[in-house]
Amino acid sequence: MATNGEKVTATVVNGGGLSTGENPKKIVDLNTTELDRTDDILDGEVKGFSDSGEKKEETDSNGIGSTAGVDSGDISPVDDIQKKIRRAERFGVSVKLTEEEKRNSRAERFGTVAAAVVNGSEGTKKAEELKRKARADRFGVPSATSTTDKTEEEAKKKARLARFGKETKVDSAEENKRKARALRFSKEASADASSDLPEKQIIGKEAAVSGSAA
């Protein structure tokens, strides 16, 4: 035991405990009320947390969270979509993307930019016109614009009216023919009926005479 007036010192070798070896690594004054911060190396239990990895993992997780929070604002929507897809593939979960996300991913995959996103409705109209022209060139059909469409529609209407107008005239002529035929056959039927009446009257008279004679 050390008295109050004595100064006790001890040597420590590599933090392995107290020893009285010839080659002391550090001399520690045990009479001081508080050890220096650099002497924490001597305490194996305190540094054991870092050796075991608990504190290290905690700090790493905090660092990852902070970097993720910083980078989240700078991440493009395409990268975010790709991350979602990779995460879903890793966990075996189906990915539900919105229409905008699907368009962005498709544009990123094919290396093109969607015309609707860049130029709005005008871009979509131009894209549709280009598609129509390309299709017309491929099939050998002249591309039809809005003006040509209107002229073609008017020409079709005129042709239809002309065609149906002729048919109405033909129908009226046919109707007149039918009326004339009906009149002719009605006259013939009436003439036949009138010619048959005298014979019927004669037959009736003969029957009456024979009946009275009997």
From Swiss-Prot:
Any one GO CC term of the record: nucleoplasm
Chain intervals for the UniProt region annotation (Disordered): 1-25, 39-78, 137-214
Residues that bear Phosphoserine: 76
Location of this chain's protein in the cell: Nucleus, Nucleoplasm
Effect of a null allele: No visible phenotype under normal growth conditions.
Example GO biological process: poly(A)+ mRNA export from nucleus
Protein name: Protein MODIFIER OF SNC1 11
Gene that produces this protein: MOS11
